[in-house]
């Protein structure tokens, strides 16, 4: 049976395609915005049946052009949290997603989709419930609105609907994301170019580099998606994070120490890295004040209750692995 991945040439989509390939799944229709031609590089080592532009996909899918489709992994979206064009964001992230959802419901196709922890905004609790949801930007709002649609249609749905609120994802195949790539990616490139990494200084009661996030490896993100793909009877909206909050300083020290290890140099503590000028703190930008999550930590209660019991990589494990992968791409 055919599988469809939207946003297939993007960061998470391409990793899902690769994970499906590793299980022997190759009857995959990859859907993406083909105006960004360079993104095809994420699929060069993947096996797919077809590669469609997003503008033609929904109509053809709704028409039944692809025969029996077992599942759609809907990862396609504008993920730029600094995008201010509300119409563009709503068209891409809300209306387009509704059209894909409607086609899946009509055909009895599993629908697994990307939600976002941006829905929680400045909340101090990250539980999949309406009272904790207060997005700070139009990206988060577009995801929030779609999750409200899901909550309304899920009770009557005859096929699986599984949404994943991704926390701070990092890992291979994100280089095309530019400024929205992970801090691990930017730290890697900064250190190679300048011999140091830069982090935000103190802000909102947090010390330099001490803003904390739930950093989750894209390897784990793909594994969770495939777990629910294998269990089509399980529906819901689930946090997808490690359940641990770690400071940006942990990312920086891991990047620096992994690169040092690759050059045969010993590991250093954060204090030693700062003292030697390998980690530098810059003033918090005015443009982000009031729109920035200083703390995120996924509540995994629902995810674990749904049967996902595998451990998640820590920053030290996942970022080390990622830096070695990036180094191998040079």
From Swiss-Prot:
Known catalytic reactions: ADP-D-glycero-beta-D-manno-heptose = ADP-L-glycero-beta-D-manno-heptose
Location of the active site: 139 (proton acceptor), 177 (proton acceptor)
Binding sites annotated in the UniProt record for NADP(+): 11-12, 32-33, 39, 54, 75-79, 92, 143, 169, 177
GO MF annotation list: ADP-glyceromanno-heptose 6-epimerase activity; NADP binding
Pfam families: Epimerase
Class in the EC hierarchy, top level: isomerase
Amino-acid positions noted as binding substrate in the UniProt annotation, renumbered to this chain: 168, 179, 186, 200-203, 213, 292
CDD domains: ADP_GME_SDR_e
Biological processes, Gene Ontology terms: ADP-L-glycero-beta-D-manno-heptose biosynthetic process; carbohydrate metabolic process
Keyword Mitochondrion among record annotations: no
Cofactor annotation: NADP(+)
Pathway per the UniProt entry: Nucleotide-sugar biosynthesis; ADP-L-glycero-beta-D-manno-heptose biosynthesis; ADP-L-glycero-beta-D-manno-heptose from D-glycero-beta-D-manno-heptose 7-phosphate: step 4/4
InterPro entries for this protein: Epimerase_deHydtase (IPR001509), Heptose_epim (IPR011912), NAD(P)-bd_dom_sf (IPR036291)
Domain notes: Contains a large N-terminal NADP-binding domain, and a smaller C-terminal substrate-binding domain.
Assembly mode: Homopentamer.
Function summary: Catalyzes the interconversion between ADP-D-glycero-beta-D-manno-heptose and ADP-L-glycero-beta-D-manno-heptose via an epimerization at carbon 6 of the heptose.
Protein name: ADP-L-glycero-D-manno-heptose-6-epimerase
Organism: Burkholderia mallei (strain ATCC 23344)
Gene giving rise to this polypeptide: hldD
């Amino acid at each position: 049976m055919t599988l469809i991945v939207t946003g297939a040439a993007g960061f998470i989509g391409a990793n899902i395609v690769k994970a499906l390939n590793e299980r022997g799944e190759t009857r995959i229709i990859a859907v993406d915005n083909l105006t960004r031609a360079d993104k095809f590089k994420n699929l060069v080592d993947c096996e797919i049946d077809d590669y469609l532009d997003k503008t033609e996909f929904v109509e053809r899918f709704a028409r039944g052009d692809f025969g029996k489709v077992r599942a759609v992994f809907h990862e396609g979206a504008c993920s730029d949290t600094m995008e201010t064009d509300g119409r563009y964001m709503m068209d891409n992230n809300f209306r387009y997603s509704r059209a894909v959802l409607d086609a899946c419901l009509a055909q009895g196709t599993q629908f697994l989709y990307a939600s976002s922890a941006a829905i929680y905004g400045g909340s101090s609790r990250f539980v999949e419930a309406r009272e904790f949801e207060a997005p700070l930007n139009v990206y988060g709002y577009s995801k929030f609105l779609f999750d409200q649609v899901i909550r309304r249609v899920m009770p009557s749905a005859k096929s699986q609907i599984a949404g994943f609120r991704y926390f701070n994802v990092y890992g291979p195949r994100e280089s095309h994301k530019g400024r929205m790539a992970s801090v691990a990616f930017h730290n890697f490139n900064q250190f190679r170019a300048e011999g140091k990494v830069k982090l935000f200084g103190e802000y909102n009661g947090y010390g330099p580099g001490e803003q904390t996030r739930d950093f989750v490896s894209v390897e784990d993100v793909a594994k969770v998606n495939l777990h629910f793909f294998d269990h089509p009877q399980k529906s819901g909206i689930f946090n997808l994070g490690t359940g641990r909050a770690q400071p940006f300083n942990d990312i920086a020290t891991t990047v620096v120490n992994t690169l040092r290890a690759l050059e045969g140099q010993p590991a250093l503590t954060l204090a030693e890295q700062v003292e030697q000028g390998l980690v530098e703190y810059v003033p918090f930008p005015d443009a982000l004040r009031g729109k920035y999550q200083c703390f995120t930590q996924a509540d995994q209660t629902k995810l674990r209750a749904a049967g996902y019991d595998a451990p998640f990589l820590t920053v030290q494990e996942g970022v080390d692995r990622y830096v070695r992968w990036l180094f191998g791409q040079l």
